[in-house]
């Protein structure tokens, strides 16, 4: 059967399955594609196809992830599923697969388990704001009161990590039963309910072009008689000729200037938007006032900081990371957007050292300020090689 062409007219949302090992994340992913395929909104993907996830390299870190896509009447979804727990940790911290929302899969037969808790914590740390719960394996539970009990436990757990547990949609069903009874509407109903909950509860993310303008400066050069040009890829928002912008980072003070011209592929543009690689001509800026590592941004939209707390995954030796642990006061480089800045690390109380393969919260103080916001990703490097990957969880000052 010919594959239906995906219409890009629908809003796009990135989601993924999270939860404890063997609670049925991959089976559920297969069940969703199977049910939606019958409505023409997906191509059915079998369990084994999802389970043998290809290895991906993201910033040098090996992550196994499966990507499937499907659509409901209202939206187009890209869905990630990871086979192993370690893959989830890496995925969420590196932002390899950005999630706008998550489906937390909990086995109704077992209730919340250690990784259930850990994935909820990770989701809250890396800025996944919306979780919909699927209580799986309901066919293995005869007593409805047990299911209610598990539901209460899950809601309490979500509340504990700052999610609105009492308002979170919880759908009860059995993904395996769905796969075994594809033509039985009664058995597949739980998938319809789940997709309805996701459609209505997880909001459509703000498009990059609707956010305030920001462009990391990659290179700087002077055009005789015209002035200084900063080049880079617009990360978010839109820039128009004549817009006021701020130059932020690498020094304490913020420089205000005006963009007097935009070039792309040697053509003059009136505006540039998220994703464009451009050169921006800046009024009254000297060549030595601007450098790689700074950002051009809409005035007031982002500020420079030196101190922050980050959630970090430390690469294993096999991933090209360190062979030995590091201790308090370790001073690597922190790579933000386009540049390395040296910083020193403070480990949490009671933590003596960090081993390759660990993930940990750490307080960092940089030697020069960087334009940053919460959920910004960074890499930790030593002599040009990546030894860790992290996300800013809180800005300290």
From Swiss-Prot:
Source organism, top-level taxon: Bacteria
Region of interest called G4, as start-end residue ranges on this chain: 136-139
Region described as G3: 81-84
Annotated stretches, region: G2: 60-64
A molecular-function term among this protein's GO annotations: GTPase activity
Annotated Gene Ontology cellular component terms: cytoplasm
Main location: cytoplasm
Subcellular location: Cytoplasm
Positions contributing to Mg(2+) binding: 26
Alphabetical list of InterPro entries matching this protein: EF-Tu_GTP-bd, EF-Tu_GTPase, EFTu-like_2, EFTU_2, G_TR_CS, P-loop_NTPase, Small_GTP-bd, T_Tr_GTP-bd_dom
Residues the record lists as binding GTP: 19-26, 81-85, 136-139
Catalytic activities: GTP + H2O = GDP + phosphate + H(+)
Assigned EC number: 3.6.5.3
Family to which the UniProt record says this protein belongs: Belongs to the TRAFAC class translation factor GTPase superfamily. Classic translation factor GTPase family. EF-Tu/EF-1A subfamily.
Subunit structure: Monomer.
Described purpose of this protein according to its UniProt entry: GTP hydrolase that promotes the GTP-dependent binding of aminoacyl-tRNA to the A-site of ribosomes during protein biosynthesis.
Protein name (database record): Elongation factor Tu
Natural source organism: Clostridium botulinum (strain Loch Maree / Type A3)
């Amino acid at each position: 059967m010919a594959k239906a062409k995906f219409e890009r007219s629908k809003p796009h949302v990135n989601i993924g399955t999270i939860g404890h090992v063997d609670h049925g994340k991959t089976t559920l992913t297969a069940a969703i594609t199977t049910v939606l395929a019958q409505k023409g909104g997906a191509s059915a993907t079998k369990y084994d196809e999802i389970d043998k996830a290809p290895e991906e390299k993201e910033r040098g870190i090996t992550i196994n992830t499966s990507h499937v896509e499907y659509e409901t009447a209202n939206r187009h979804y890209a869905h990630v599923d990871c086979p192993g727990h370690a893959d989830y940790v890496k995925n969420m911290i590196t932002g390899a697969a950005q999630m706008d929302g998550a489906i937390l899969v909990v086995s109704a037969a077992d209730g919340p388990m250690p990784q259930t808790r850990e994935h909820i914590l990770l989701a809250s740390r890396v800025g996944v704001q919306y979780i919909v719960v699927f209580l799986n394996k309901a066919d293995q539970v005869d007593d409805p009161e047990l299911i209610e009990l598990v539901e209460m436990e899950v809601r309490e757990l979500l509340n504990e990590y700052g999610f609105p547990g009492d308002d979170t949609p919880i759908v009860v069903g059995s993904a395996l039963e769905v796969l075994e009874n594809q033509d039985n509407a009664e058995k597949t109903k739980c998938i319809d309910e789940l997709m309805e909950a996701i459609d209505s509860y997880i909001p459509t993310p703000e498009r990059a072009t609707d956010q305030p303008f920001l462009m990391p400066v990659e290179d700087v050069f002077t055009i005789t008689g015209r002035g200084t040009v900063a080049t880079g890829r617009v990360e978010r928002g839109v820039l128009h000729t004549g817009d006021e912008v701020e130059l932020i980072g690498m020094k304490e003070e913020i420089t205000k200037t005006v963009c007097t011209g935009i070039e792309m592929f040697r053509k003059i543009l009136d505006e540039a938007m998220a994703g464009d690689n451009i050169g921006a001509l800046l009024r009254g800026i000297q060549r030595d006032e601007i450098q790689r590592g700074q950002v051009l941004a809409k005035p007031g939209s982002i500020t420079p900081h030196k101190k922050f707390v980050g959630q970090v995954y430390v690469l294993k030796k096999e991933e090209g990371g360190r062979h030995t642990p590091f201790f308090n006061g370790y001073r690597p480089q922190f790579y933000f957007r386009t540049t390395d800045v040296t910083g020193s690390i403070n480990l949490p109380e009671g933590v003596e050292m960090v081993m390759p393969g660990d993930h940990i919260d750490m307080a960092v103080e940089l030697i020069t300020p960087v334009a940053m916001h919460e959920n910004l990703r960074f890499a930790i490097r030593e002599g040009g090689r990546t030894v860790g990957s992290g996300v800013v969880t809180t800005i300290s000052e």
